[in-house]
């Protein structure tokens, strides 16, 4: 490209471009496309000015170079191509002698006939996009903009093209020639793709014809034309008095602005009532795994084979019995369902060849547990039109529940490290493009911090269960299929490990719509005695099914093994999102990355290495009643990941509403902390909107409690 530039352009232009690049500290050996762009822009500016003069009568005339009248006054003053100091001297001189307004940015030319500065643009993109970028950067009515493209298009302020058609045609022909020459040498594609936009884009262009008529018709009441409305909008001072803005609005808007002070906000009111209960689709901190290391059995990787192999590792099975009944369920059916699973697994083991999948016998206990024949009969609406008292059945309001300590314990546990590795390096995704070294480094550091995290185990468990359940729902719609709940990991030594958490039995699953529900019964192993926190296990029937020998510092001890059984349901859309729980890794990585970027911009260098390797530095993790909690960067990574995972596990309309409404209050509080003197109206309405989302969801209640801690410490 450098050779092409030196051959293609006048040596004077090349020299000016070299000086300009040197002035801005750019290396023309590296930035060859920029070198070509500067030369092109300089040549267009010179061609724009060439042959244009002003005669004694003040008229613009075009005169060829060898004309004796060439001593006439030049129409254009060339500013582009001068060093910055000299260029500003020329601009100041023009402003002083002509009374023109001083521009914020150095323009390219001054037109003595029209008495205006001109900004010349040469773009490899679409002219209107580049024009908008230029207009928004300059933000001046007094600088005229004229854009040329390499395809022969042009655009100018108010469609005023300044020059005669022949002069503009010369410029377009020259640009087209440059493009052809570059293309012949295989340089054009690289040059075209290398153009960077101006800083910002603001669409401020003339609207004409049909669009103009539509714009005039679409105005709010009391505005006669688009110009009036624009003037009104421009008159809205962004930091002006809110009351003034409100007074300009419709008479129906009646809002009194109250100053928001440190004493203004009150805590969010959490509901009273019985403690909230566990509602996740699978057990979290209370789950127990039956595991096999370095699996190499026949059929390894087939879920049913893996499950049977894991079940064989436990020898403490005993006659199951109910230790915590479900208050409203037929608990004997849950007990019989587990016995049926054990019996049918035993039958499989007695067969010569283990099948790849297992469909359970449709016994009365499973039919009850899976809600078979329980759905009300659907009747076509047209057949009901004549029924006078036809109405939707009454549904009870959900019972209010209070915050319980178990959900905070669940979250704390999700942030902890386990002794297994749950994701490989490529779980977040390999580099698709030759991405910069820094991005890969950040990903590797982040993966190292979260690969052992319990929240990561929940991701892999959720992905597996949802994938298996969705597959079975589509492949075996009428069957009560037995689905093992499995995960895979590596030990610290790198040995592979397969884990069995329990089983799911899927009900009938003719899922036509995304929201159609498939019922399932989950049966999950645990060492947690449900009688310690019975309120947490309201939806479960818990059986004692065996005794497990555990090694501890004082020797072996026996602990009862429980089975948590419940009826549950999910839908195609929920399973689809459950299968994509790995997104949580990406979301939390991006949050960490924005922290690194903020730090790097302060230090003016990439801080990734220091960020992760400076073990002595602590970072804010969150608020608690004790104040701002701080921890290592690894703890921050794991906490952000756990929050993202819990948002997925406990997704609900209550969470959506609380997040959206509490964010508004958060922004006002942050504005107060930044001394921006915020004002509010209808703060009571905002609190009402937040508090109507606090019903019974444990994760939402915990977030509301955290928000109250934040309010307390933020407003001290």
Curated annotation (Swiss-Prot):
EC number(s) per entry: 3.1.-.-
Family from the record: Belongs to the influenza viruses PA family.
Positions of Mn(2+) 2 binding: 80, 108
Motif Nuclear localization signal 1 (NLS1) in this chain: 124-139
Binding site for Mn(2+) 1: 41, 108, 119-120
Listed name of the protein: Polymerase acidic protein
Cofactor remark from the record: Binds 2 manganese ions per subunit.
Subunit structure: Influenza RNA polymerase is composed of three subunits: PB1, PB2 and PA. Interacts (via C-terminus) with PB1 (via N-terminus).
Entry comment on modification after translation: Phosphorylated on serines and threonines by host kinases, including human casein kinase II.
Functional summary from the UniProt entry: Plays an essential role in viral RNA transcription and replication by forming the heterotrimeric polymerase complex together with PB1 and PB2 subunits. The complex transcribes viral mRNAs by using a unique mechanism called cap-snatching. It consists in the hijacking and cleavage of host capped pre-mRNAs. These short capped RNAs are then used as primers for viral mRNAs. The PB2 subunit is responsible for the binding of the 5' cap of cellular pre-mRNAs which are subsequently cleaved after 10-13 nucleotides by the PA subunit that carries the endonuclease activity.
Entry's Gene Ontology BP terms: cap snatching; DNA-templated transcription; symbiont-mediated suppression of host gene expression; symbiont-mediated suppression of host mRNA transcription via inhibition of RNA polymerase II activity; viral RNA genome replication; viral translational frameshifting
Lineage: Viruses, Riboviria, Orthornavirae, Negarnaviricota, Polyploviricotina
Coiled coil: none
Metal-binding is among the record's keywords: yes
Originating organism: Influenza A virus (strain A/Memphis/110/1976 H3N2)
């Amino acid at each position: 490209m450098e050779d092409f530039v030196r051959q293609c352009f006048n040596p004077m232009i090349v020299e000016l471009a070299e000086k300009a690049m040197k002035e801005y500290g750019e290396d023309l050996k590296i930035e060859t496309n920029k070198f070509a762009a500067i030369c092109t822009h300089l040549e267009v500016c010179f061609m724009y000015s060439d042959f244009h003069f002003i005669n004694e009568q003040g008229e613009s005339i075009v005169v060829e170079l060898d004309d004796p009248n060439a001593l006439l006054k030049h129409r254009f003053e060339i500013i582009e191509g001068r060093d910055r100091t000299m260029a500003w001297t020329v601009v100041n001189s023009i402003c002083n002698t002509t009374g023109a307004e001083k521009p914020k940015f150095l323009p390219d030319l001054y037109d003595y006939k029209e008495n205006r500065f001109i900004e010349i643009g040469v773009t490899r993109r679409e002219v209107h996009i580049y024009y908008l970028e230029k207009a928004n950067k300059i933000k001046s009515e007094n600088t005229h903009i004229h854009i040329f493209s390499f395809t022969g298009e042009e655009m100018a302020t108010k469609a005023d093209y300044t020059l005669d058609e022949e002069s503009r045609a010369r410029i377009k022909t020259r640009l087209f020639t440059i493009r052809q020459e570059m293309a012949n040498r295989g340089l054009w594609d690289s040059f075209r793709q290398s153009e960077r936009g101006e800083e910002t884009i603001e669409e401020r262009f003339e609207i004409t014809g049909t669009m103009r008529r539509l714009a005039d018709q679409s105005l709010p009441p009391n505005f006669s034309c688009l110009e009036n409305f624009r003037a009104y909008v421009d008159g809205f001072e962004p930091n002006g008095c809110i009351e003034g803005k409100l007074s300009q609005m419709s008479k129906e808007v009646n809002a009194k602005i109250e100053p928001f002070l440190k004493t203004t906000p009150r805590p969010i009111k959490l509901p009273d009532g019985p403690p909230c209960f566990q509602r996740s689709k699978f057990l979290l901190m209370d789950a127990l795994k039956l595991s096999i290391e370095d699996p190499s059995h026949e059929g390894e990787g087939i879920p049913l084979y893996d499950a049977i192999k894991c079940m064989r590792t436990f020898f403490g099975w005993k006659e199951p019995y109910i230790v915590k009944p479900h208050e409203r369920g037929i608990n004997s059916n849950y007990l019989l369902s587990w016995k049926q699973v054990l019996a049918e697994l035993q039958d499989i083991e007695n067969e010569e060849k283990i099948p790849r999948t297992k469909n359970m016998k449709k016994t009365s206990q499973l039919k009850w547990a899976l809600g078979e024949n329980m759905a009300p009969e659907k009747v076509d609406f047209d057949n009901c039109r004549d029924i006078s008292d036809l109405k939707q059945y009454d549904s009870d309001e959900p019972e209010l529940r209070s915050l319980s300590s178990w959900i905070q314990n669940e979250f704390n546990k999700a942030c902890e490290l386990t002794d297994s590795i749950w994701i490989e390096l490529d779980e977040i995704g390999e580099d698709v493009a030759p991405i910069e070294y820094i991005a890969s480094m950040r990903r590797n550091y982040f993966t190292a911090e979260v690969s052992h995290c319990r929240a990561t185990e929940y991701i892999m468990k959720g992905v597996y269960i949802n994938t298996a359940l969705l597959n079975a729902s589509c492949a075996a719609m009428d069957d009560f299929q037995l689905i093992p709940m499995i995960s895979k990991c590596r030990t610290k030594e790198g040995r592979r490990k397969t884990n069995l958490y329990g089983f799911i039995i899927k009900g009938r699953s003719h899922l036509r719509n995304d929201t159609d529900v498939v019922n399932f019964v989950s049966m999950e192993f645990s060492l947690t005695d449900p009688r310690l926190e019975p309120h947490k296990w309201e939806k479960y029937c818990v059986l004692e099914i065996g005794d497990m020998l555990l090694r501890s510092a004082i020797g072996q001890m026996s602990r009862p093994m429980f089975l948590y059984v419940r009826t549950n349901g999910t839908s195609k859309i929920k399973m689809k999102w459950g299968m994509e729980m790995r997104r949580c890794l990406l979301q939390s990585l991006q949050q960490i990355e924005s922290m690194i970027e903020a730090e790097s911009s302060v230090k003016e260098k990439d801080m990734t290495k220091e960020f992760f390797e400076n073990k002595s530095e602590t970072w804010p993790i969150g608020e608690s009643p004790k104040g701002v909690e701080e921890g290592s960067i690894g703890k921050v990574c794991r906490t952000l990941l756990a929050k993202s995972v819990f948002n997925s596990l406990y997704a609900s309309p209550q969470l959506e509403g609380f997040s959206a409404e509490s964010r508004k209050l958060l922004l006002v509080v942050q504005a107060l902390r930044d001394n921006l003197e915020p004002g509010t109206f209808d703060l009571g309405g905002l609190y009402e909107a937040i508090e109507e989302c606090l019903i019974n969801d444990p994760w939402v209640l915990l977030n509301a409690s955290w928000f109250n801690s934040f309010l307390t410490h933020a407003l001290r």
